[in-house]
A protein has these predicted regions:
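Non-catalytic nucleic-acid substrate-recognition regions in nucleic-acid-modifying enzymes
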Residues: 2-47, 78
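Conserved AdoMet
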Residues: 2, 11, 49, 53-90
């Protein structure tokens, strides 16, 4: 895992260990993208839209899925897949 200077490998590992829901990972991804000053604009309006797309696509879900799905718990493998994409994106 490579990480930006602000988002460390430990931070990413902590996310897998401690975060639980899709909502948690969208919020975490927004924070990572902002901390790494990631440019958005290729189809995403802002960091929230980019984070939502990244997380939902990783889980093979429509970004416009019912809001109740955001409170679904994730498997460790799903969490790791999201963190791996965050690492690549930042």
């Amino acid at each position: 895992m490579e990480a930006s200077a602000l988002i460390t490998k430990t931070t990413l590992a902590d996310a897998v260990a401690e975060l639980v829901t899709i909502r948690d990972f969208i919020r975490f991804t927004v924070s990572c993208l902002r901390s790494a000053d990631v440019h958005v604009g290729h189809g995403s309006e802002d960091h929230f839209a980019e984070a939502s797309a990244l997380v939902m696509q990783t889980l093979s879900l429509q970004w416009s899925a019912d809001a109740e799905i955001l409170d679904a718990k994730l498997l460790r493998s799903e969490k790791q897949a999201i963190v791996d994409l965050i690492d690549k994106r930042i």
